[in-house]
Amino acid sequence: MLSIILKESVRNLGKAGVVTKVKPGYARYLLTQKKAVRATKENLKNLEEQYLVIERENLEKLEAAKALKLSLEDEFLIITRQAADDGKLFGSVTPKCISKLLSDKGYNIHYRNIFFYSVIKYIGEYVVNLELHPDLVLPITLYVVKNDLGAMQAQKLHAEKKRKIEKEVEEGSGTSVDESLKLDSVSDSIDTSGVNSSDKEEENNIIE
C-alpha cells in the first residue's frame, strides 16, 4: 500500500487534503491523473500550504467540469451487443465500454469515473453516471440494442421523449428538458427485436 494526499475528493476514498493508503496500481492512476500526490515527509510537512494549492486547483477543475457538463447534456449513447431471444446479452456492458463510446464522440472520460447501479446484462435502456468532478455527476441515457433496427428505434424514442419534455417545459412544468429525460430514462423502454424492457435485479455499484 502507498500513502498519498488527495488533491481532490475521490469517491470511496475521501475529501481533498486527506492522507490515505491505496494499492500501487490505484495510486499510479491517481498520481497520473493528478488527483493525488505522494505522502512524502516534505509534502506532509507542507500539508497546510499544499491544501491551499489543492483548493485552488479543485475550483479550477470544477469550472472545467461545469463546461464539460454543458456540452454533454444533450448526448445519449447507443451500444450494439449480441443477445439471446429473451434480450439477455452474451457478456455485459462495462464502464470501459462506455468510456470508449464517449471517446468516439470526442469526450475523454476515464472508465474509473463512470458508474452505474445495476449490472447491464440485458437489451434495454439504462442510466449511466459520469463523474465529471467529485462534486458534479451527470447521468446520461444509454440504449443497449442488438441490431441497426434497434439503434434506429432508440434514436426515435429519444427524440420523441425530448419533444414531449420540451412541450411540457413550454407549458410551465418547471423541469428542464435534460432533467426530465434523465428522470424518465429507465421507465419507458420499448419492447422490440432491437430494444427490450430491461431486467435490472442487481443493485451493486458497478465500477470496472
Curated annotation (Swiss-Prot):
Keyword Oxidoreductase in annotation: no
An individual GO BP term: translation
Q: Name one GO molecular function term.
A: structural constituent of ribosome
Record-linked InterPro entries? Ribosomal_bL9, Ribosomal_bL9/RNase_H1_N, Ribosomal_bL9_bac/chp, Ribosomal_bL9_C, Ribosomal_bL9_C_sf, Ribosomal_bL9_N, Ribosomal_bL9_N_sf
Superkingdom assignment: Bacteria
Q: Which Gene Ontology terms of cellular component type are present? A: ribonucleoprotein complex; ribosome
Q: Where is this region: Disordered?
A: 161-208
Keywords linked to the UniProt accession:
Ribonucleoprotein, Ribosomal protein, RNA-binding, rRNA-binding
Chain intervals with Polar residues compositional bias: 186-197
Q: Which family does it belong to?
A: Belongs to the bacterial ribosomal protein bL9 family.
Q: Which HAMAP family match?
A: Ribosomal_bL9 (MF_00503)
- Name the NCBIfam families on file: L9 (TIGR00158)
Tell me, in a sentence or two, what this protein's role is: Binds to the 23S rRNA.
User: What protein am I looking at?
Assistant: Large ribosomal subunit protein bL9
Protein source organism: Ehrlichia canis (strain Jake)
